[in-house]
């Protein structure tokens, strides 16, 4: 604590990201894509004219927003972009959720949500997951100043159908419903087609997972024009140039190579299902997943103990200190070779 900190900063409990090791480890703890970005991204990086870096980027990132609009079949005016989906989410919390009524969110979900609430003085209420570790959408049918949830959820991996989200929106018309789709490309069903019917729906996404661009920081939101205008007002009161020139061009290149995107996505899904079966044969309970990770617990061994044993063997997975999750591990899907190494290590640990 410093005497120079404001009282609000003293009260913060910051988000703790997954470990980013300096030594060479098999890294299955932060849900990064195991495959490189599309070849067009590498071409952008190799051929980018360095002299252009002396110029500010387009503050609206119009070309990138146009590419996203084409990809998702919406108008350019319905697209917002930011420096990673974390920034997009942070701006959305400021723009829409500082209300007299509480924001509703799952008790177990992306742990940045309560951090934003504390930072921006957003009143919120957590909703417990059901006995199958699913977000209970009907539990959001109470008086609220907004609803936010990840679909598929993290760290559990379960995703709701588009019809289920539409039913939620039919019942909640007076506040913003934010659906965080960071993992939707690995088997979930996107809510983006619903934005034409529901002006209070905001869908956020990221290039970090299915597009392999975690190192460049690029996220987006899709919604009604009035919601996008609200995000722009907050952004332009904070940072008018959140996306640099290289990232704009790289993002466009990633979007244009649909075949590469589909191939990588299918590889991750195939490896996930193969890994699920192998984990179950070792005595793990594996939650159904529509994401690029598996949420698991062993019938005998404690999660923390397995986490430590794997780390000693050079493999990082994610363990959460939260009491309700202490028996669980979240395992990112890596390459086939990386998952083979994981299974080999677990065979030794859980013998």
Curated annotation (Swiss-Prot):
Keywords, ordered alphabetically: Amino-acid biosynthesis, Aminotransferase, Histidine biosynthesis, Pyridoxal phosphate, Transferase
Top-rank taxon, per record: Bacteria
InterPro entries noted in UniProt: Aminotrans_II_pyridoxalP_BS, Aminotransferase_I/II_large, HisP_aminotrans, HistidinolP_aminotransfase, PyrdxlP-dep_Trfase, PyrdxlP-dep_Trfase_major, PyrdxlP-dep_Trfase_small
One GO MF term attached to the UniProt entry: histidinol-phosphate transaminase activity
Gene3D superfamilies xref list: Aspartate Aminotransferase, domain 1, Type I PLP-dependent aspartate aminotransferase-like (Major domain)
GO biological process, any: L-histidine biosynthetic process
N6-(pyridoxal phosphate)lysine PTM sites in chain numbering: 209
A Pfam family per the record: Aminotran_1_2
EC number(s) recorded for this UniProt protein: 2.6.1.9
Subunit structure: Homodimer.
HAMAP family: HisC_aminotrans_2 (MF_01023)
Name of the protein in its database record: Histidinol-phosphate aminotransferase
Organism: Chromohalobacter salexigens (strain ATCC BAA-138 / DSM 3043 / CIP 106854 / NCIMB 13768 / 1H11)
Gene field: hisC
